[in-house]
């Protein structure tokens, strides 16, 4: 019979029968060794996480998988420094944490208990703190942790008879009760409330997306149109079984009331719950949520780009969410276009309607207006991360990374990555041909470094045949050639003196004027 310490040191473990396991445990229960509290370090916790989340698919076979599991277990339990009692303490501590409610487990982990006894003391302190002064919400932390379990039990009985609203999952505190709570419990309360609220919000959207519509109505101020086509039952968010499945947070609901569903991004502000609590007939402490300056459903919403106004009467407009139109009620104003758009959009549907507010604009025009802002720079290069507002700009940009040069010069065979560069290059050839005149006296053949014609042309296209000096204008070349020919076409009428430049003649004539004065 081998003791537990020797079993830990075996490099290649073997499977023990149930009888052998019982004998080993019975033999090891006789130890009388003093032990110290187990303190889990960061490395120990990391090893435990690796051991618990080890995946078989990452190894080549069962032997390697068993070997790695054995190694990770040794790194976690550390049998070379921990006693047998400390190892069992680690296992019991882990299991104890696993059976606690999620919120309580999170709070206990933040306190970093050394052993299971310390953990029990922490939980008892929370219970005693909530029981002080006959608080009406006994064990509120545990009650908050069991909210989801209660909702699970209600969902197992079948489809709910009444729609589930935010009031059904809220835990209320008075101002006096809130002042008596510890800061850690307050943070826990705030996080649980926001989590439940987000669950309701997300499941509401999923239910709308999975619901088939026989007819959808779009209403404007004067007209009404009925949708002709049915939305396919299978959407990209195929959530047909949402009523019978458990969400990632353990909340099961089938539908929500319109009054219980906020706008798509309303929950981003934590004080939204406090300001809208009357809708659910609940009482929340004001101190529980940080005040922020955000829009309510009753406030106007303006397009930040050009102040165009949209009045969306449906807070659950899936089509609006997809294209980026803010799904909240309001009548914002458009100062730039002086055009108002009002429509009622209850879900995704074919766009059939026109609206008469000065101009006849279709629903697609309204959506395209906002989409022009929300989808700006929506085409991103996967190599450098640069974004563009048009797909053609992205394609032209990607040529830089690929090195492709699809534009070829028919004169010299040189390639360019942009059409504009080819056009500029071809202009050099055209000007070079014009430079083979008698004024320049030098012709450029294709054989003279045709791959780089700018060496010949550059910015100076006109070259003097006498001294080789180049000029970028023909008039400058003509004026320069007068130096070599000695020609002086500008003659003074006073003294008959001739000059090769008109500027020199003007200066000379000023001398005559000064002498006369």
Swiss-Prot record:
CDD domains for this protein: KRAB_A-box, SCAN
Localisation: Nucleus
Annotated ranges, domain KRAB: 164-237
Protein name listed in UniProt: Zinc finger protein 215
SMART domains tied to this protein: KRAB, SCAN, ZnF_C2H2
MF-aspect GO terms: DNA-binding transcription factor activity; DNA-binding transcription factor activity, RNA polymerase II-specific; RNA polymerase II cis-regulatory region sequence-specific DNA binding; zinc ion binding
An example Gene Ontology biological process: regulation of transcription by RNA polymerase II
Gene Ontology CC: nucleus
Disulphide bridges, residue numbers: none
Record-annotated SCAN box domain positions: 48-126
Record SUPFAM superfamilies: beta-beta-alpha zinc fingers, KRAB domain (Kruppel-associated box), Retrovirus capsid dimerization domain-like
Main location: nucleus
Purpose of the protein: May be involved in transcriptional regulation.
Alphabetical list of PROSITE patterns matching this protein: KRAB, SCAN_BOX, ZINC_FINGER_C2H2_1, ZINC_FINGER_C2H2_2
UniProt keyword terms in alphabetical order: DNA-binding, Metal-binding, Nucleus, Repeat, Transcription, Transcription regulation, Zinc, Zinc-finger
Similarity comment text for this entry: Belongs to the krueppel C2H2-type zinc-finger protein family.
Zinc finger (C2H2-type): 379-401, 407-429, 462-484, 490-512
């Amino acid at each position: 019979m081998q003791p537990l310490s020797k079993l830990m040191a075996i490099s290649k473990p073997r499977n023990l029968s149930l009888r052998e396991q019982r004998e080993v445990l019975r033999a090891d229960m006789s130890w009388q060794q003093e032990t110290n509290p187990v303190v889990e370090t960061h490395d120990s916790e990391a090893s435990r996480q690796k051991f618990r989340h080890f995946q078989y698919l990452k190894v080549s076979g069962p032997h390697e998988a068993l070997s790695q599991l054995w190694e990770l277990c040794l790194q976690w339990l550390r049998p070379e420094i921990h006693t047998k009692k400390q190892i069992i303490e680690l296992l019991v501590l882990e299991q104890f944490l696993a059976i606690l409610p999620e919120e309580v487990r999170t709070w206990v982990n933040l306190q970093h208990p050394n052993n299971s006894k310390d953990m029990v003391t922490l939980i008892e302190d929370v219970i005693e703190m909530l029981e002080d002064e006959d608080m009406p919400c006994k064990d509120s932390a545990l009650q908050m942790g069991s909210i989801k379990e209660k909702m699970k039990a209600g969902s197992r009985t079948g489809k709910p008879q009444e729609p589930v609203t935010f009031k059904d999952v809220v835990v209320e505190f008075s101002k006096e009760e809130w002042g008596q709570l510890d800061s850690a419990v307050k943070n826990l309360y705030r996080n649980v409330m926001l989590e439940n609220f987000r669950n309701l919000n997300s499941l509401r959207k999923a239910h709308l997306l999975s619901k088939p519509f026989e007819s959808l109505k779009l209403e404007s101020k004067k007209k009404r149109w009925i949708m002709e086509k049915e939305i396919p039952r299978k959407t990209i968010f195929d959530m047909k079984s949402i009523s019978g499945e458990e969400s990632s947070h353990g909340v099961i609901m089938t539908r929500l009331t319109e009054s219980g569903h906020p706008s798509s991004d309303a929950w981003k502000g934590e004080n939204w719950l406090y300001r809208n609590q009357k809708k659910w007939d609940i009482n929340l402490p004001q101190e529980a949520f940080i005040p922020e300056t955000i829009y309510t459903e009753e406030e106007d919403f303006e397009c930040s780009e050009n102040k165009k106004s949209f009045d969306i009467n449906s807070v659950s407009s899936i089509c609006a969410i997809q294209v980026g139109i803010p799904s909240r009620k309001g009548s914002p104003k458009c100062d730039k276009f002086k055009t108002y758009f009002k429509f009622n959009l209850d879900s995704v549907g074919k766009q059939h309607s026109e609206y008469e507010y000065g101009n006849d604009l279709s629903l697609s025009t309204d959506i395209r207006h906002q989409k022009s802002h929300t989808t700006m720079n929506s085409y991103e290069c996967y190599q450098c991360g640069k974004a563009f507002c048009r797909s053609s700009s992205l394609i032209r940009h990607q040529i830089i990374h690929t090195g492709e040069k699809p534009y070829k010069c028919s004169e010299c065979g040189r390639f360019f990555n942009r059409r504009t560069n080819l056009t500029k290059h071809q202009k050099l050839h055209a000007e070079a041909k014009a430079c083979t005149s008698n004024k320049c006296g030098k012709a450029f053949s294709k054989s003279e470094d045709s791959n780089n014609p700018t060496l010949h042309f550059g910015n100076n296209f006109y070259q003097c045949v006498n001294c080789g000096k180049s000029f970028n204008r023909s008039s400058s070349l003509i004026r320069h050639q007068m130096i070599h020919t000695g020609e002086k076409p500008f003659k003074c009428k006073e003294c008959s003196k001739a000059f090769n430049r008109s500027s020199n003649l003007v200066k000379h004539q000023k001398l005559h004027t000064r002498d006369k004065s």
